[in-house]
Amino acid sequence: LTAAPGKEPGPAPAPGQYDLGIERARDTLLYVPAALRQGRPAPLTLLLHGAGGDAAGGLGLLSGYAEEHRLVLAAPSSRTSTWDGVRGVFGTDVKAINRALEQIFQLVFVDPNRIAIGGFSDGASYALGLGLANGGLFAKIIAFSPGFIPPALRTGRPHIFVSHGDRDNVLPIDRTSRRLVPLLNREGYNVTYREFRGGHAVPPEITQEAIEWLGWE
């Protein structure tokens, strides 16, 4: 990714949910909280949907907390049914995400030290791969029920939050997070890991903990 936040772009956009208008189909959604403070850089979290999903599904991961915590949220859609890196090659989805970030940085005054990437299921796997490859951009990564980490050259040392249900029959925990988290720990990453009783889902208490872990308002 080459997009990077810059100087304050001008008046803050009106609060609400927007299509960015940069893709003919499966556009990126941007959510601007009413509590956004003019003249103060805001935290941004990029959210990635699971397989078969779209931007609305990604946005819904944290949208219920955006107002209280003054979070700007952005949710792209994969170009096909899931993210390209999950299929083994980073390509068109990375380009679309970069276009979206460039547009967002022109609209919103974003704090360069408070940018996160997160996702659920395939989106969590992609968030890990893209986040670890762009650790100079993303300070934190949230991975709800990831399957694996797509290989890529890594930069920076983002902090990582991982959650997984102990009864997940889509991405069974013994083959996924219980292997990934120790690996990340051995590689020196700061990882917060939460298992919960349940399946392939993101329970409200896990979402709440992830928000508190972000610590951004």
Tell what function each PLM region has.
Residues F161-H164, D168:
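Short beta-strand/loop motif that positions the catalytic acidic residue
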Residues T155-I160, E187-Y189:
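Short, proline-enriched alpha-helix->beta-strand connector loops that line the catalytic pocket
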Residues T80, R194-V202:
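Histidine-bearing beta->alpha loop at or near hydrolase active sites
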Residues G58, F105, N113-R157:
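Primarily recognizes the serine-hydrolase "nucleophile elbow" in alpha/beta-hydrolase
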Residues N169-T176:
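Conserved alpha/beta-hydrolase "acid-adjacent" motif
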Residues P13-L29, A34, G39-F109:
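Serine-hydrolase catalytic machinery in alpha/beta-hydrolase-like enzymes
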Residues L1-L44, V89-T92, D122, L130, ...:
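A domain-start/cap signature at the N-terminus of enzymes
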